[in-house]
Curated annotation (Swiss-Prot):
GO terms for molecular function: ATP binding; glutaminyl-tRNA synthase (glutamine-hydrolyzing) activity. It catalyses: L-glutamyl-tRNA(Gln) + L-glutamine + ATP + H2O = L-glutaminyl-tRNA(Gln) + L-glutamate + ADP + phosphate + H(+). Heterotrimer of A, B and C subunits. Pfam families: Amidase. One of its GO terms (cellular component) is glutamyl-tRNA(Gln) amidotransferase complex. It comes from Methanococcus maripaludis (strain C6 / ATCC BAA-1332). GO terms for biological process: translation. Keywords: ATP-binding, Ligase, Nucleotide-binding, Protein biosynthesis. This is Glutamyl-tRNA(Gln) amidotransferase subunit A. Belongs to the amidase family. GatA subfamily. Its EC number is 6.3.5.7. The active site is at residues 55, 130, 154. Allows the formation of correctly charged Gln-tRNA(Gln) through the transamidation of misacylated Glu-tRNA(Gln) in organisms which lack glutaminyl-tRNA synthetase. The reaction takes place in the presence of glutamine and ATP through an activated gamma-phospho-Glu-tRNA(Gln).
Length: 431
C-alpha cells in the first residue's frame, strides 16, 4: 500500500538527524496517498507511488518555499511549479521541502537559516550544496528520489559527496517555471536519485516544453543507448586540478569505460582558469537582479536585512559590478569569456561523444570548518563549465576514500542528454 510506504518514510524523516527537510506536511501527503490509491488512471504511470522530495526553492502549493532563508521564512507556495505538476501527473507524491544553501548560494549545505545539512555517507562532513537536503534525503533513504536545481554544480556536487546519482539536464530541457532563480542563464532543474535508471525515468517525467518558460524545449523521450563504440574524452586540465586520491579513483572509473569497448581520447581545455571568475561575475550580476523582488513589500522581508553572510556578499558584489562604470570592466568581459569557453567546450565534442572526469577536485570538508570564500568556490571549478556552456552532465558513484564517496562526472554536448544518461546507467552496471 502506498499509504504504508508514505508512513514509513514519514517515520524515518521524524527520527532522522540529517536535517534534510525544512517542511513536511504529514497530513497532506497521507491524504494525497489515499487519493492516489483510488486513482486507476495513474496506476500505469512511471512514477506511480514514488515519494519525492523537492528543493525549497521550487514552488509546491501549500508548502513553505523559503529558499532556506529568513527572508522567506513565512512564505507558503500558492501554486505548483511546472515540474511539480508533471510529477503529480506521473503519479508521484511530494513528501516535503528539502534544506539547501540559502538562496542556492553555496556549495556546502551549511548556509541555511534552518541549520546545516549532514552528509549521511560521512556524518562529520558537508553533504555539498546547494541541493544539500535533496541529496541527503536520497542518501539517507528518506524518500524514493528528489528534485534539485543546478546553477554551477548544485545537483552534481552533493550527489558526488553523498554517494548518489545526480543529473543536470541541458539548458532548456526542463522548465524552470516556479523556480526561485539564482542566475537564470545558468539555472536548471534536475533529479537526484539512488540509481541511474531512476535518473532517466525522473528526467523523462519532468522534461518538456512549457509556454511559461521561453527557454524550454521539446525533446524526444530519452531512451537507453548502446555506448560500446563511444569515444570518451578525458580532459587533462580537469584531472590536473584534482587531488591525487580522487584522481586515482576516477582513473579506475575510466578503465571501466575502456572495458565496455569505449575508446579513450585525451583532450585539453585551455580555459579552465577562466571557469570560476567567469561564472561568479555573471552569477553575481544575475543574482543581484533576481533578488530585487525580495523588497519586503509583496512577501517576505527585505533581503539585505534578513539574509546571511554569503547571500549578502553576492548581492553587494553584484550591485557593484552592475553599476554602469564597472560593467565594461567586469561583466561584459565575463560574457566574452563565456562565449570563448562555450566555443572551446563544444569543439571538444567533435573529438568525443562524452567527457568523463572528477566532479569535485577535493573531498568534502568537515562540518563547521572555516573556509575562505575562495576556498569554498574552488569546489565548483569542475562543475561550472557545464552551466557556462549549457551542456548536460551527470554524476555516478565511483569508489570512495576512507568511506567518503567519490563521484564520476559524465558530460555531453547540448541536448545529448540521452547519451549521458545511457553512459551513467552502463557505468553503474559495469563498475
Amino acid at each position: 500500500m502506498i499509504t504504508d510506504r508514505v508512513s514509513d518514510y514519514l517515520e524515518k524523516i521524524e527520527k532522522s538527524d540529517v536535517n534534510a527537510f525544512i517542511d513536511v506536511n504529514s497530513e497532506k501527503v497521507l491524504k494525497e496517498a489515499e487519493e492516489l490509491e483510488k486513482n486507476d488512471y495513474l496506476k500505469n504511470k512511471p512514477l506511480y507511488g514514488k515519494i519525492v522530495a523537492v528543493k525549497s526553492n521550487i514552488n509546491v502549493k501549500g508548502y513553505k518555499i523559503s529558499c532556506a532563508s529568513k527572508t522567506l521564512e513565512k512564505y507558503t507556495g500558492t501554486y505548483d511549479a511546472t515540474v511539480v505538476k508533471k510529477l503529480r501527473l506521473q503519479g508521484a507524491l511530494i513528501v516535503g521541502m528539502t534544506n539547501m544553501d540559502e538562496f542556492a548560494s553555496g556549495s556546502s549545505g551549511e548556509t541555511s537559516y534552518f541549520g546545516p545539512t549532514k552528509n549521511p555517507a560521512a556524518m562529520d562532513r558537508i553533504p555539498g550544496g546547494s541541493s544539500s537536503g535533496s541529496a541527503a534525503a536520497v542518501a539517507a533513504d528518506l524518500c524514493d528520489m528528489a528534485i534539485g536545481s543546478d546553477t554551477g554544480g548544485s545537483i552534481r556536487n552533493p550527489a558526488s559527496h553523498c554517494g548518489i546519482v545526480g543529473f543536470k539536464p541541458s539548458y532548456g530541457v526542463v522548465s524552470r517555471q516556479g523556480l526561485c532563480d539564482l542566475a537564470m542563464s545558468f539555472d536548471q532543474i534536475g533529479p537526484l536519485t539512488k540509481n541511474a535508471e531512476d535518473a532517466l525515468v525522473l528526467t523523462n517525467a519532468i522534461k518538456g516544453i512549457d509556454r511559461s518558460d521561453s527557454t524550454s524545449l521539446e525533446t524526444p523521450k530519452f531512451e537507453k543507448k548502446d555506448i560500446s563504440n563511444y569515444k570518451v574524452g578525458v580532459v587533462k586540465e580537469f584531472m590536473d586540478v584534482t587531488d591525487e586520491k580522487i584522481r586515482n579513483e576516477i582513473e579506475k572509473g575510466i578503465e571501466v569505460f575502456k572495458d565496455m569497448g569505449c575508446k579513450i581520447v585525451d583532450l585539453s581545455y585551455k580555459y579552465i582558469d577562466l571557469a570560476l571568475p567567469t561564472y561568479y561575475l555573471i552569477n553575481y550580476v544575475e543574482f543581484f537582479s533576481a533578488t530585487r523582488k525580495y523588497d519586503g513589500r509583496r512577501y517576505g522581508e527585505f533581503i539585505e536585512e534578513a539574509c546571511g553572510e554569503e547571500v549578502l556578499r553576492r548581492i553587494l558584489i553584484g550591485k557593484h559590478i552592475s553599476e554602469q562604470e564597472f560593467s565594461g570592466k567586469y561583466y561584459k568581459k565575463a560574457l566574452q569569456a563565456r562565449k570563448a569557453m562555450k566555443k572551446e567546450m563544444l569543439g571538444l565534442f567533435n573529438s568525443a561523444d562524452l567527457i568523463v572526469g572528477p566532479t569535485v577536485p577535493k573531498l568534502p570538508h568537515k562540518l563547521g570548518e572555516d573556509l575562505s570564500p575562495m576556498e569554498m568556490y574552488a569546489y565548483d571549478v569542475l562543475t561550472v563549465p557545464t552551466n557556462i556552456c549549457g551542456i548536460c552532465s551527470g554524476v555516478v558513484r565511483c569508489g570512495n576514500i576512507q568511506g567518503v564517496p567519490v563521484g564520476l562526472q559524465i558530460q555531453g554536448a547540448p541536448l545529448e542528454d540521452e547519451k549521458v544518461l545511457s553512459a551513467m546507467i552502463e557505468f553503474e552496471k559495469n563498475y
